[in-house]
Amino acid sequence: MDLVIMNFVFLLYLTSVVKCSIKLDFNKVSTPSKYTKRDALPMPLINDKILYTTELEIGSNKDKVSVSIDTGSYDLWVMSNDAVCYKVSEFQTEGAPQLPDIFNDIDQDYSCTFNGTYNSKSSKTFKNTSEDFSIGYVDGSAAQGVWGYDSVQFGQYGVTGLKIGIANRSSVSDGILGIGIANGYDNFPVLLQKQGLINKIAYSVYLNSSNSTTGTILFGAIDHAKYKGALSTVPVDSKSQLSVNVTNLKTKNGNVASGGHSILLDTGSTFSIFPDEWIDALGHSLNATYDEDESVYEIECDGYDEHFFGFSIGDSDFSVPIQDLKTEKDGQCYLAIMSNSVIGGGGILFGDDILRQIYLVYDLQDMTISVAPVVYTEDEDIEEILNPNEDQNEVPTSTSFTQSASSSGSQPSSTISGENMDKNTTSSSSGNCQTRSWIAILSALFLVYIHII
């Protein structure tokens, strides 16, 4: 995996329909990628990774900026047009842990402005808050700048008055569009609903298979073709992050953990984060060898067809192939799950490697998440998520659960220091839609970018 960096571009489209057929043609391009996260849960920098990003147009000049889509945070922040880019060793979060090499390359050379910048000074719709913006990540990367408000356009639609962090110094390669639980102000999903673009603050996520080049997110709607059985609805068990109770954690050879555990379901993370004992159980089930230098388990690169990591959420059972939980470096394969003891805190997280097996419906209004085993298909059966005041189920074809779980986690607090602060120097669409409702459904398609380094 050291040779390939994959970056999914998330292209947004808004339609005032329920049933749509949309054809998109994309160009395959090369792009550097270097990403970590965030403030809901400390995260590792993962050098060979998949990013889900959307191209936004910000301000009166419609500056084009690509930002990572993240259910684990709630802010939008982007690079300023005058941003200075640094290596992490030059501009970093103090006290960041030493991460295993297979997850981290803090001195990779890249441009933080590669994915576009925003010129707030030339935007006629920009409003300065005079607040300092600062964010630091567990891998050591950081960004600083100012907060402001401006309009954000996506396709032919947009929202106004969205709070934006504008970074003028950064050792992070990509800005972030957080679509998680709002905290203190109306973030992107809330404004979509308040400004009449969707009926309810809810969206569904379909990441598709690990070798696919496409996936979809629908704001305000569900695609029934993308899952099997019934959606199982469970409560979000945190006021600040989109985590749920997960049970029945197991492998082919036995249990990984007993009871229920609060786990963040985070599309903004390529890999998952487990406690040491869970990783040990997985490693032992594979007869893997622990690499003391890398602090990870060495595994075979193939031959695990019958092995899996299983778990349950509500009434739904899931099975993740072990092949989806590995990474490769210099011809050696590893079990690619980060230990939460390495990054500090007791938080547990399911990243994209696991979430590809789940069709997810995040309801930020009712604070629930609905899940079902995913079906990989190009078929569509899209239905809007109804207004809670209507006398119908808000999430169609679902069963509900109320469960308790043990939960532990940590919120990062970071200060930033700088040394050696020298400056580093299309798509098309077509389709037919049958109008059935005024309710707008915001949909998205992802395109994979492959970069050989």
Curated annotation (Swiss-Prot):
Biophysicochemical property: pH dependence: Optimum pH is 6.0.
Superkingdom assignment: Eukaryota
UniProt xrefs under InterPro entries: Aspartic_peptidase_A1, Aspartic_peptidase_AS, PEPTIDASE_A1, Peptidase_aspartic_dom_sf, SAP-like
Topology class, membrane: Lipid-anchor; GPI-anchor
Function recorded in the entry: Secreted aspartic peptidases (SAPs) are a group of ten acidic hydrolases considered as key virulence factors. These enzymes supply the fungus with nutrient amino acids as well as are able to degrade the selected host's proteins involved in the immune defense. Required for cell surface integrity and cell separation during budding.
Active site residues per record: D70, D266
UniProt signal peptide: 1-20
Residue intervals of the Peptidase A1 domain: 52-372
Lipid attachment in record (GPI-anchor amidated serine): S429
Secreted listed as a keyword: yes
Record's catalysed reaction(s): Preferential cleavage at the carboxyl of hydrophobic amino acids, but fails to cleave 15-Leu-|-Tyr-16, 16-Tyr-|-Leu-17 and 24-Phe-|-Phe-25 of insulin B chain. Activates trypsinogen, and degrades keratin
Compartment annotation: Secreted; Cell membrane
UniProt biased composition (Low complexity): 397-417
Top-level enzyme category: hydrolase
Predominant localisation class: secreted
Molecular-function GO term, any one: aspartic-type endopeptidase activity
Protein name (database record): Secreted aspartic protease 10
Biased composition (Polar residues): 423-432
Maturation and modification: The GPI-anchor is attached to the protein in the endoplasmic reticulum and serves to target the protein to the cell surface. There, the glucosamine-inositol phospholipid moiety is cleaved off and the GPI-modified mannoprotein is covalently attached via its lipidless GPI glycan remnant to the 1,6-beta-glucan of the outer cell wall layer.
Propeptide: 430-453
S-S bonds: C85-C112, C301-C333
Alphabetized UniProt keyword annotations: Aspartyl protease, Cell membrane, Cleavage on pair of basic residues, Disulfide bond, Glycoprotein, GPI-anchor, Hydrolase, Lipoprotein, Membrane, Protease, Repeat, Secreted, Signal, Virulence, Zymogen
Region (Disordered) location: 387-432
